[in-house]
Amino acid sequence: MRYWAWRVQAEDPLPPPDIQIFALYHDSAGEHALPDSVGLSTGLMVLAHVYADRAAQGENNVVLAHELLHTLGASDKYDAGTGQPRAPDGLGEPLRQPRYPQNIGEIMAGRIALGPEEATMPASLQEMRVGAITADEIGWR
């Protein structure tokens, strides 16, 4: 991937970017999971697997933003085994009482927690927030 990114950059007459983001679009027909997207802090590049469907634009933007924040040093806020947002760091409203359902998600959790074992994909970035720990990791606080 780094070689390919270098080749793309070498042929580009514009000044080199700080971060390179590549979106690989997949057919949205059928029920299939996409390969994992990757954001690399070394090399500052993103390879995001997203759906080629206007209806998926909001979800695609969440994936792109999530991976972009990895390049800046943010860590995942979800359980790697289940994909569930980790409480409280992976919750958009960590102090909410009752805790569930959450109305918004933490961008590095990638989903909105509806319960301890249930989550949904956000429809857009407007349903996500950068939590305190993520803000610290990327130097916003």
Question: Which residue ranges define each predicted feature?
Answer:
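Surface-exposed patches in mature extracellular/periplasmic domains of secreted proteins
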Residues: 7-9, 78-82
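Metalloprotease/metallohydrolase-associated module, dominated by Zn2+-dependent proteases
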Residues: 37-42, 46, 50-55, 83-141
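Metzincin-family zinc-dependent endopeptidase catalytic domain
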Residues: 1-62
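Short loop/turn segments at secondary-structure transitions that flank enzyme active sites
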Residues: 27, 54, 75-78, 114
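Active-site recognition of the HExxH zinc-binding catalytic motif
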Residues: 61-77
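Glycine-centered secondary-structure boundary/capping sites
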Residues: 10-16, 73, 96, 101
